[in-house]
Amino acid sequence: MLVFLHAVLVTALILLLIGRIQLLERLLLSHLLNLTTVSNVLGVPDSSLRVNCLQLLKPDCLDFNILHKVLAETRLLVVVLRVIFLVLLGFSCYTLLGALF
């Protein structure tokens, strides 16, 4: 019975972790969109004050590859955690059915 309780606790923690990682994924997507927007605005030849102010915000290196790599890693981590969750859920159900019968 103690093993069953541990499995239930771990599955609940995995669900919370998946939620946090999905929040991180949304933040990464938002950051990537913001950098793309700033990069597109700065690419427009315009001498207005708006573009001059945005040039101050432009980072030295807009490396989108790093952001795409991190985004792919977070998505892979979510998939791995979902597989672990399903395995633990199956184990919990199997243990519970074994205890009942």
Curated annotation (Swiss-Prot):
It is found in: Host membrane. InterPro entries: Corona_7. The chain crosses the membrane at residues 76-96. Pfam families: Corona_7. Residues 1-23 form the signal peptide. Its main location: host cell. It is a single-pass membrane protein. Keywords: Host membrane, Membrane, Signal, Transmembrane, Transmembrane helix. The keyword rRNA-binding does not apply. GO terms for cellular component: host cell membrane; membrane. Belongs to the coronaviruses ns7/ns7a protein family. May function in the formation of membrane-bound replication complexes or in the assembly of the virus. This is Non-structural 7a protein. It comes from Feline enteric coronavirus (strain 79-1683) (FeCoV).
